[in-house]
């Protein structure tokens, strides 16, 4: 029989105190909704339905083309939310997973185990449960003397005995699809919240003598639902530990995994060394045997093998193998540093291609430039690429030597093996094999300094 899935993503998330829908807050680089969707994908649902409501279009954009959607215009409880999916799933043979979109720590493995347990035990409903040291706020799993699940009691409706139970409802279930929608027609709002509880269908199944089971998570952390910023930070912490552990198992060295922040889609090859306080975001890739030192921050970039990035920021760029960057360099979007490039102290590169083995050691700005191989930039070089309205390109050919404090006024071309003298302002193209000097000639005024206040003769 087929698997189906319903993801509940309609809530406002009032306790988040945010204009953003709760399920769109991010954990380790992707939204909570995406984490849940990826976990659900492991069970290979024949159809996935996402229930949306608050700021529905924002939520729809995240899974557009990957899920069917249904609207819950009024938030009248979890049971009501699942009712909204009936049009998409009614009459289908199989089992349906129901899961909240604010549970980013759930794993696909656990959901697969839940489905298998449900099918193997021929249950009409199976509850995913966990054991909590402090169960306050959770619905409790109530069992009879034979260990069978009889009902789920919400915190506000639980008596003193029921409040002592530590087995809690995670809010994730598997149901026989047809029986789910049949039972939903018989639930009501006669409870402390005045809502349609999805959990009431469990009591209906039990009253009909149908089999209800529970599968317990091995790891309570997977059950975490995020309702506020405190829980969001907890989820981030758990996810960070998982991600870093996986990379370490796969051969990456961490100086301090508790102070290293890596998004879930980052790829790192073996034998990379990562020092403390490094952040890798988005879809960054890091090649083998590279070293990322303390304070490095990389976003959506590809870093080649055997590179060394020292306390620098790289955004939406490519750094090829054997390059060195930093310390305190900034590689801005749409840049490419080719093999063996050295970008040093306080150098900024933006929207530029830097050829093989080119060096810009310190205090340089390279913007909107195409630079050949084996070029040397002296300290203080500036490509002047913006006139207040438009950006212009600088082209520097192979083996050029750019003297310290050169100002290159784009648009500009500097030929192969050309040299610009230190301190020059270059406004015209420089032919290959030429020296360009664009500065005033020095004039010495002998004896003039005697009249200046700093001169010893002027001191009293």
Curated annotation (Swiss-Prot):
Pfam families linked: Hexapep, Hexapep_GlmU, NTP_transferase
Annotated catalysed reactions: alpha-D-glucosamine 1-phosphate + acetyl-CoA = N-acetyl-alpha-D-glucosamine 1-phosphate + CoA + H(+); N-acetyl-alpha-D-glucosamine 1-phosphate + UTP + H(+) = UDP-N-acetyl-alpha-D-glucosamine + diphosphate
Binding site for Mg(2+): 102, 227
Region (Linker), start-end ranges: 230-250
GO biological process: cell morphogenesis; cell wall organization; lipid A biosynthetic process; peptidoglycan biosynthetic process; regulation of cell shape; UDP-N-acetylglucosamine biosynthetic process
Sorted UniProt keywords: Acyltransferase, Cell shape, Cell wall biogenesis/degradation, Cytoplasm, Magnesium, Metal-binding, Multifunctional enzyme, Nucleotidyltransferase, Peptidoglycan synthesis, Repeat, Transferase
Subcellular location: Cytoplasm
Gene3D superfamilies referenced in this protein's UniProt entry, alphabetically: Hexapeptide repeat proteins (2.160.10.10), Spore Coat Polysaccharide Biosynthesis Protein SpsA, Chain A (3.90.550.10)
Pathway: Nucleotide-sugar biosynthesis; UDP-N-acetyl-alpha-D-glucosamine biosynthesis; N-acetyl-alpha-D-glucosamine 1-phosphate from alpha-D-glucosamine 6-phosphate (route II): step 2/2; Nucleotide-sugar biosynthesis; UDP-N-acetyl-alpha-D-glucosamine biosynthesis; UDP-N-acetyl-alpha-D-glucosamine from N-acetyl-alpha-D-glucosamine 1-phosphate: step 1/1; Bacterial outer membrane biogenesis; LPS lipid A biosynthesis
N-acetyltransferase: annotated span: 251-460
Annotated signal sequence range: none
Amino-acid positions noted as binding acetyl-CoA in the UniProt annotation, renumbered to this chain: 379, 385-386, 404, 422, 439
DNA damage keyword on record: no
Metal-binding found in the keyword field: yes
GO cellular component, one term: membrane
Residues at which UDP-N-acetyl-alpha-D-glucosamine binds: 8-11, 22, 72, 77-78, 139, 154, 169, 227, 332, 350, 365, 376
Region (Pyrophosphorylase) residue spans: 1-229
Molecular function GO labels: glucosamine-1-phosphate N-acetyltransferase activity; magnesium ion binding; UDP-N-acetylglucosamine diphosphorylase activity
Active site: 362 (proton acceptor)
Source organism superkingdom: Bacteria
Summary of subunit composition and partner proteins: Homotrimer.
Family per record: In the N-terminal section; belongs to the N-acetylglucosamine-1-phosphate uridyltransferase family.
Function: Catalyzes the last two sequential reactions in the de novo biosynthetic pathway for UDP-N-acetylglucosamine (UDP-GlcNAc). The C-terminal domain catalyzes the transfer of acetyl group from acetyl coenzyme A to glucosamine-1-phosphate (GlcN-1-P) to produce N-acetylglucosamine-1-phosphate (GlcNAc-1-P), which is converted into UDP-GlcNAc by the transfer of uridine 5-monophosphate (from uridine 5-triphosphate), a reaction catalyzed by the N-terminal domain.
Name recorded for this polypeptide: Bifunctional protein GlmU
Organism the protein comes from: Streptococcus thermophilus (strain ATCC BAA-491 / LMD-9)
Protein's gene: glmU
